[in-house]
Amino acid sequence: MFLAAAPYFQTRFQDNESILAHFQSAIISVGTITNLGSMLILGAMQSKASYPKRIISALVLNIIVFILLSISTSYFRDVSSGGYLGFTLIMVFSTSIATGLCQNGAFAFASSFGRPEYIQAIMTGQAVAGVLPSVAQIISVLAVPPPDNWASAETLAAVEGKDNTRSAFVYFLTATGISILTLFATFPLVRKHSRILESRMQMLTSVEEAEQAKRKVVGMWTLYKKLHWLAASVFICFAVTMFFPVFTQKIVSVVPQDKAPRLLQPGTFIPIGFLAWNLGDLFGRLSTLLPFSMRTCPIVLFIFSILRGGFLPLYLLCNIENNGAVIKSDTFYLFVVQGGFGATNGWLGSSCMMGAGDFVQESEREAAGGFMAINLVAGLTAGSLLSFAAAGIS
């Protein structure tokens, strides 16, 4: 969510070079560390968990955060870069807690049915959630009238800053609306879930008791012994993936800015880079629906997760911070690098998450879903910390 709004944050932090260079890695690190911590805590709270309540709480928290972000684009503009970075990181912290609640609730809830396609649906939904912010950011930028090409450089910079601010306002407001719609869409699912549990266990006094009675508390070590290859694969997969946002917000079109159409200006090209990656990710996750599947071959998935690191050097061939590209092609960057890196992430991540239920007992599936989600977030956290090494590349 925060990554696709990079042009807006670059405008807010432009008077502090240190923050401008490292805000992306700071956002990623705070987000993933908080997410991992919340997932570990929630994973240890299996016996009394109400997963539908966790999902609803996450959506309410997201709505509050996105409203505050929308307000911040128009008010408190005189806040220093350091002050606004602090506010942004608090918002990241809050959304990461919400993400932990939602991921834990959704994966555990879906895993309890023992149907891999339910996990695949969640993974695909996450990919769609990655595509929509990029699309919203691009549309919001293009919706603003283009600047006067005859204006001075100072005027153009000021106009670009205002455009990024308006785009960010529309962007965060759209996220608020989507979160509200999702919250209302969740209520029928919760009611259906309650009816299923009540019909299964009419002897118990409440739906929450029915949920808890059928739940088996499983230790992390027990799950690791059964799922170590898949857990390692999903960890490495997402650790490698976390380098892409750092490079994406640095890479601009090979077409000179004074000759580039508006679609290739940094304000739109950076979101297009995120969109290309997320579309590849969506395609990769959907490809797991094909009859050919590798989720029953965890060692092969582990080897593939290591080989996937070969995508990272390809970013060095692109136009980082407009310093020139080795391969002077936006097509190469968007389709081969971003699209390919995203597609392999979607396919590998989904295959690992879907395969977990095949290697545990039925009573352990719910815990296995939460366990795999923890490894996924742990990979994101490790990758975000390692991505600081790439922050200084230009």
Regions found by a protein language model. Name each.
Residues 330, 334-343, 352, 357-392:
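A late C-terminal transmembrane helix in Major Facilitator Superfamily
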Residues 96-104, 241, 342-350:
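Small-residue-rich segments within alpha-helical transmembrane domains of MFS-like 12-TM solute carriers
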Residues 26-97:
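Eukaryotic helix-linker segments that join adjacent hydrophobic helices
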Residues 7, 16, 64, 72-91, ...:
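Membrane-interfacial loop- and helix-cap regions that link adjacent transmembrane helices
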Residues 18-22, 104, 111-129, 267, ...:
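Loop-to-transmembrane helix entry/capping segments in MFS-fold secondary transporters
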Residues 100, 115-233, 237-242:
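Eukaryotic endomembrane system proteins
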Residues 40, 127, 131-146, 378-393:
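A gly/Pro-rich, aromatic-decorated transmembrane alpha-helix motif that marks the paired
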Residues 26-47, 64, 131-134, 271, ...:
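Central cavity-lining transmembrane alpha-helices of secondary-active solute carriers
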